[in-house]
Amino acid sequence: MKILVTGGGGFLGQALCRGLVERGHQVLAFNRSHYPELQVMGVGQIRGDLADPQAVLHAVAGVDAVFHNGAKAGAWGSYDSYHQANVIGTDNVIAACRAHGIGRLVYTSTPSVTHRATHPVEGLGADEVPYGEDFQAPYAATKAIAEQRVLAANDASLATVALRPRLIWGPGDQQLVPRLAERARQGRLRLVGDGSNKVDTTYIDNAALAHFLAFEALAPGAACAGKAYFISNGEPLPMRELVNQLLAAVGAPRVDKAISFKTAYRIGAICERLWPLLRLRGEPPLTRFLAEQLCTPHWYSMEPARRDFGYVPQVSIEEGLRRLKASSAA
């Protein structure tokens, strides 16, 4: 089968491409840049922007299914830039699937679409948690819009499903763990609150596996068609324990210092005002959204994913940490 993966050059995107090739599929990746890693895998590459409808239409031509993983992620930036990539880009993918008669669309979403300030989510499935309101971050806001459009597009000719993997980590990660480690080594990392809030994470192989299983089960009228699912390792840990285990795996110093949520929230608000005012580059070290995320319990039920497409995490956190440590030492 010929499959297109949008955002195939990213951390999860490369895992999806690699796994699909291993499963015997012909894989194309749609990215804004060329990735030598994909070339080594034997993955075809098409360069373009998700916000360009003609580029997306061209990329989708001739494929049998689409994994729409491409997105603008992050905790900072203009709403329009996120809207163009995440909402308009998703609209373009759906339209291209319609135009070319594609039958299956697997969408990579995020648990952040249900973010509601410091309201906890503990042990619930996606159908038990409403979408968020008054988002403090354009990423979460635009991903929520995009997810709803993907699910609304599900019908007899195009089967769709949305997966919400939580905090993906593992060897090859260039974002989550490297940023934590850098700040820890600089003595700039702090916990928000007492660090007792339990959170879910997802080892990279498990995140990819969930996509493959959902894809294989997806068809018009299938149990997973038109639905969203939280995805994780199903092993929630207190934030303090999680962060320090990840830091230890990459040889970074542990973090014990903490600031209160109120202090973190105020710092985030100040950063959000100063960054555009002073025209500072990059992302601020803290935002209101991040402050809320870092102190709030977020862990989910894997039962819906197990029931509807057989998802059972294959790599435990303990084994994932061992693999991360080995890759860091290599």
Swiss-Prot record:
It is an enzyme of class 1 (oxidoreductase). Gene3D superfamilies: NAD(P)-binding Rossmann-like Domain. One of its GO terms (biological process) is steroid biosynthetic process. The active site is at Y139 (proton acceptor). Involved in olefin biosynthesis. Catalyzes the reversible stereospecific NADPH-dependent reduction of 2-alkyl-3-oxoalkanoic acids to 2-alkyl-3-hydroxyalkanoic acids. In the oxidative direction, syn-2-decyl-3-hydroxytetradecanoic acid is the preferred substrate. In the reductive direction, (2R/S)-2-hexyl-3-ketodecanoic acid is accepted as substrate. This is 2-alkyl-3-oxoalkanoate reductase. InterPro entries: 2-alkyl-3-oxoalkanoate_rdct, 3Beta_OHSteriod_DH/Estase, Lipid_A_modif_metabolic_enz, NAD(P)-bd_dom_sf. NADP(+) binds at K143. GO terms for molecular function: oxidoreductase activity, acting on the CH-OH group of donors, NAD or NADP as acceptor. Its EC number is 1.1.1.412.
